[in-house]
C-alpha cells in the first residue's frame, strides 16, 4: 500500500537538497528529519501540510530565500515542476498533486489528485493483505512487560501495561523489528519467601490446623484463596510431613513447585487476556545462580560508577520519597546514578551483602544486551518514574551506548461498574483479578479499550459501558463498521455475482473503476477515501512514538465516517452503497467498502482482535 505522506516527504527532501546546493547551504541529516508532512485539519486549506520552509528558514538567512514565504514558494514550485519524476511502483508520471498553495506562516498546503487516491484504494482492494513498510530491518528489541511478582493471579491494575506491551510488540513485529516478548520472573526476592510462608499457612489448614485470617494479617502473608489448591498439592506430595520442619528445611522442598504453579496460573491469566510471551526469564536461575549480578557490577566498577560508601541522610528526610529503606549507617555498595541526573546515588549491595532491586535490573540489562537486543522497551507504572534516569545510565554504560532504553510510563486505570468501584475478589484476597474483568467484558473489549486513551493518561474503565451496543462503546462501533462492510459485500455478491475472494476478479473490478472518484462526489465518500489513504502514516507515527493508541483512535474515526455514510444512504437512496440500476457507481462504492473492510481488519490484527463479520 502506498504511503503518500512518506512519498511526498522524500520528494520534499530531494527538492530542498537541490535548492540548498544552488544557494551554497549545507543541510545535515537531522535538518532533513525535523520537518513534517501531515494531514490538514481544516480541509478548506487542502489535504496535506508541510512545514519544511519554517524548519529550515534559518539555514537560508544569508541567501535570497531569506523569507519563509519565498523559501516555501521556491520549494512548492520545484515540487510541482518535478512531480512527474516521483517514482511510485517503479513508475513515473503519477501526478500526486492537484493543487498547491502557501499559507502566511509558511506552510506548504497540498490538495491530492484523484488519480493518486484512486491508486491507493485500488491497491488495497487488489492485494491479498495490506503490507506494512519495513521500518525495523530486523533490529532486535527486547520488550519486557506484564511481569508482576509471581505471588498471585494477575491484578486488574497490571492489565494496562500488559496490553500496551503486547499490542506494541505486535506492531513492531509487523513493521520488521525482531521482537522478543519477555516475562521477567521476579523469583529471587523477599516476596517469594512471603509466598512460601503463605502457602505453608494454607498447607497447615489443609492438614487440619486452625489458621485464622488474622494470622495472615499479623505476619503480612498473602490472604488469597488461590493458594489453597497449591497447598493441597503439597499435601498430596508430602502428606503432613512438612508440619514439623523449619523454614530452612521446608523452603527448598516446596520452592520450585510453588513458583512453577504460580507461573502457570499467571500464564493462564495472560493467555485469557490474549498474551503469550516468547521467553520467561527467571531472575534466580539466570542472574543469581549464574553470578550475573557481580559480573555487571564489575563492568560498572571499571567505569568508576560503583563505590563503597554511605548515603548521607535517609532519603525520606530530604522529601525524595519513601526509599529510606536504602539508608544504613554502615557502608554500602553504591551506583553513581547522580552522574545521569538522579537525585542521589543508589544502593546496589546492602550492608548485609544482599542485592537491591537495582542490582538485579543492572544484571538483567546486561543479559538483554548479551543476547543481542539493541532496544530495551519496558512499560512500567507511573510509580516507577524515578527509575528512568538511573536505569538509562546503566544501559548506556553497560552497552557503551550501543543499546537504547525506552521506558514507557502507564497511568493507573480505575475500574468501575454502574458508577461504583469494582469490588475486590474473595479468591484474590485484597484485589480485583484480571480474570474477573475478562469474564465480564471479554478480552477483545479489554484489549481495545485499554488503548483508547494515551498510556500516560489516567482514566475510568466503566464495565457497564463496555458491554453496550452503542457508539459510546469503541470496540463495538469499530466491529459494527466491519460487519456492515461484510453485509454490503455479501449482498453485492448475491446480486451481481461478484466473487470478492477471487484476486483476478477484484483486479478486473478495480481496472474498470480506476477513476471511480469521478463517480463518487459526496463529501463524506471523498473524506473517507482520504482517511483510508492515511493508514500507513498512522502506522508509522505509532511506531515512531511507541503509541499504539493512535491506531485505536484512527479505527474509531474510520468507523464513525463509515456509519455516517451508511446513515446518509438510509435517508437518500442515491447514496446507498448498492444501486441496482447504476452498476458504475455501485462498483465504485464496493471498491471503497472493500478497501475500508481490509483496513479495519488490518488495524484490529495489531490488537490481536478478530474482525466480526456479523453482529450478534
Language-model regions, residue ranges each:
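Non-catalytic interaction-recognition regions
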Residues: 2-118, 125-616
